[in-house]
Amino acid sequence: MIPALWIAKTGLDAQQINMNVIANNLANVNTNGFKRSKAIFEDLIYHTVQQPGSKSSEETISPSGFQLGTGVRPITTEREHSQGNLSKTNSLKDVAINGNGFFQVQLPDGNAAYTRDGSFQINPNGQLVTNNGFLIQPVINFPANGNNMSVSRDGIITVRIPEQTQPIRVGKLYLANFVNDSGLSNIGENLYQETEASGNPSISSPGSHGTGLLYQSYVETSNVNIAEELVNMIQAQRAYEINSKVITTADQMLQKLSLL
């Protein structure tokens, strides 16, 4: 079998994965707090006919050697945690992070998760939750007669109570920060969980220890750049076509060999 067939096959597989990643980015262009991914590749092991620096004759040394590549493989999908644009909304419960950090969420099984999606709601128990009903941590309880919710830049939440002149504080939002954001595990529903690669979360007040500030009545939009993704898609398509052409050409070479 001509090695080019296998090499081109690895190229097809790689570009298919690349296209899947691009498609997911484009599918989530309107997802609040979504962070785009990119596929990372590496070349496969080389078949070494002659090592660089080895003797090519008794008196000469090969300056670059003779090594044949065997293809490519994907090694990771890297999440890019660059800032998305802040979009103005009409909801006092929407909160966007401008800078680093994640909101803390408690899952139904008690485990912790983290999100950049600050489109919050208040559940029937008067608690601040995500759109999926997951509790924001630490738990923030709103009085039944509270109104005019206000969120300060550093996360302090206040409401107004009838017949009281001053707003009352009902809680505070804290942000989790990680040494390696890309090491977080995506679990869907705009949520991440920590891993050994991400390191443990560092919990801080917004605006301190490298975390961003909060903006009420805003949501962070997806950081997907449609034009960039379309360019990447065209490049992936062309690479796929080229590898397909290699397979076709190698097949034609095999056919000619079989006639000899």
From Swiss-Prot:
Pfam families: Flg_bb_rod, Flg_bbr_C, LlgE_F_G_D1. It is found in: Bacterial flagellum basal body. Residues 52-67 have a biased composition (Polar residues). Its main location: other. The keyword Repressor does not apply. Coiled coil: none annotated. This is Flagellar basal-body rod protein FlgG. It comes from Buchnera aphidicola subsp. Baizongia pistaciae (strain Bp). The lineage of its organism: Bacteria, Pseudomonadati, Pseudomonadota, Gammaproteobacteria, Enterobacterales.
